[in-house]
Amino acid sequence: MADSSFDIVSKVDHQEVDNALNQAAKELATRFDFRGTDTKIAWKGDEAVELTSSTEERVKAAVDVFKEKLIRRDISMKAFDAGEPQASGKTYKVTGDIKQGISGDDAKKITKLVRDEGPKGVKTQIQGEEIRVTSKKRDDLQTVIAMLKQADLDVALQFVNYR
């Protein structure tokens, strides 16, 4: 019998993040408590979002609005890393990064967790920014998926190519 396998990845649907950003921008433009504060949200490059406002409290509230929209679009908060508000002239600015891919350190943590706590006979391989998990039994793979979903990791994980 052939080995079964799946891949562990950390990817964010760019279109869903864009939809959340547009919804947040619309809410910031129409909400009463943001009137006159010149609060804006926009892309900064491909993987970062920039929020600006006239006060520190308003920019923090804008970050909360954006996080709420991300949650409604089923995007994990582990994939969004908002920095601290920084004063620049008369405005405050927050830059948040959209994290994609599994870093080398996180990949090592995940493979060590699977090796130590997972069922015997499960093998892991780090392949760039994803991890391949193989086993002779599909039940073992499902056990590994359940274990990783319960684990408190710093990365939003998705499980793809289950075969």
UniProtKB/Swiss-Prot annotation:
One of its GO terms (cellular component) is cytosol. One of its GO terms (molecular function) is nucleotide binding. SUPFAM superfamilies: YajQ-like. Keywords: Nucleotide-binding. It holds the Pfam family DUF520. InterPro entries: DUF520, UPF0234-like_C, UPF0234_N, YajQ-like_sf. Belongs to the YajQ family. HAMAP family: YajQ. Nucleotide-binding protein. This is Nucleotide-binding protein MMAR_0920. It comes from Mycobacterium marinum (strain ATCC BAA-535 / M).
